UniProtKB/Swiss-Prot annotation:
One Pfam family it belongs to: Herpes_DNAp_acc
Region (Disordered) location: 318-343
Lineage top rank: taxon: Viruses
InterPro entries: DNA_pol_proc_fac_herpes (IPR007013)
Name of the encoding gene: 59
Record organism: Saimiriine herpesvirus 2 (strain 11) (SaHV-2)
Transmembrane segments: none
Bias-annotated ranges (Polar residues): 325-339
The protein's name: Gene 59 protein
């Protein structure tokens, strides 16, 4: 008979419903994007934070709330820091969404309990919610799939080179322009301190935003203007669809306006800056975008390296121009064999030349 292992309750957190309700507007704005995301309880074991991760194409969305935990359970049995991650949508084919329940209406208490077997990481999660009618409750138990490793936030460890705060009107204008050029895949984003402008470039098309340059973010007190805290001129390339989505996610009326941060290593981050300075100090909403190479340029360079002699030059040579065909390189021979339409064209030209040569008459004068 196989040995059985007893499941032990290891750790639990209780949330502040009032804090969750304050963030309902933000959650409703991003809920479609975080449905398939990951929830993470992280930070100090005695006062962890709630974070939601999700993939946005070639970007990573992060929604974090501090000071949202009202109590913890079995804190003395845990290490100093905790980090447990689980999927937002419960596995098993059901439609239970943890975020939908946590940010729901009339929630009186909300707790998450994590358990495991001896010597193993967290394997099970139990959610319990009680509502204000003092009658209704929700209980849900699920497994935590192994190997869920959310994106490690190492971006904040690097220095910020420049910041640009956009007004809602400018952000909407840039979104529309990016959607019109989404077929080009990548967009170049550059900020220039001398000209005090933000420049977005897609091939031959350019969009320029004039900035009010300031020395500190605290001076960006008018959300209807475009501000810039530019320490260095910097440029990077990102995915055009991801940038458009990031601007829309970080633009929440009355709450956030989008702010573009330029980090070292060509990392771009779009975050939500509070409309009222000093508010939402325990909340962060950001989308991290990484440098995307220009695929068209890379493909052209690869083709140039592979074909040192242009294949088209081998195919367009006219046999009438030369009496003796030169020896072709291996690249040209391969190209002419693979491109079958060129062979009938060559035979047709030779046939026309033969016909012309037959019509030539040589006159002989015996008197000379």
């Amino acid at each position: 008979m196989a040995d059985t292992q007893t499941t032990h309750f290891s750790y639990g957190v209780g949330f502040k419903p009032c804090v969750l309700q304050e963030h309902t507007k933000i959650y409703n704005h991003i809920k479609a994007k975080v449905k398939d995301g990951i929830i993470q309880i992280e930070g100090l074991t005695s006062s962890p934070s709630l974070r939601i991760w999700s993939s946005i194409g070639e970007g990573i969305l992060s929604f974090k709330i501090n000071n949202v935990v009202s109590e913890v359970f079995n804190c003395h049995m845990m290490p100093e820091n905790v980090s447990v991650s689980f999927r937002n949508i419960s596995p098993g084919g059901n439609t239970f969404l943890y975020t939908r329940e946590l940010f729901g209406c009339n929630v009186k208490t909300a707790t998450l309990m994590f358990s495991n077997r001896s010597g193993k990481p967290f394997e099970f999660i139990k959610a319990k919610l009680e509502y204000c009618d003092k009658v209704s409750t929700t209980r849900h138990t699920s497994t935590i799939p192994a190997g869920i490793l959310p994106f490690v936030e190492n971006v904040n460890s690097t220095s910020v080179l420049s910041r640009v705060v956009l007004s809602p009107k400018t952000a909407a204008m840039l979104q529309k322009w990016l959607r019109e050029h989404k077929a080009h895949k990548t967009v170049s984003v550059m900020v220039n301190s001398t000209l005090a402008v933000l420049i977005l470039t897609v091939e031959d098309s350019t969009k320029t935003v004039d900035l009010h340059i300031v020395d500190d973010m605290s001076l960006c007190n008018n959300p209807s203007k475009d501000w810039g805290v530019v320490q260095n001129d910097v440029q990077t390339k990102v995915n055009i669809t991801a940038l458009s989505a990031a601007l829309g996610l970080c633009k929440i009326p009355g709450v956030f306006v989008p702010c573009i941060k330029f980090y070292e290593s060509e990392v771009l981050e779009v975050c939500g800056t509070p409309v009222k300075l000093g508010s939402w100090v325990d909340t962060s909403l950001q989308v991290t975008l990484f440098c995307t190479p220009n695929l068209a340029e890379d493909t052209q360079a690869a083709v140039s390296d592979y074909f040192p002699i242009s294949p088209s030059a081998c195919l367009t040579a006219d046999p009438a121009d030369t009496q003796e065909e030169p020896t072709l390189s291996s690249n040209c021979q391969d190209s002419s064999v693979e491109n079958s339409p060129a062979l009938p064209l060559k035979r047709k030209r030779e046939k026309d030349i033969n016909k012309k040569s037959k019509k030539i008459k040589i006159a002989f004068n015996p008197l000379i």
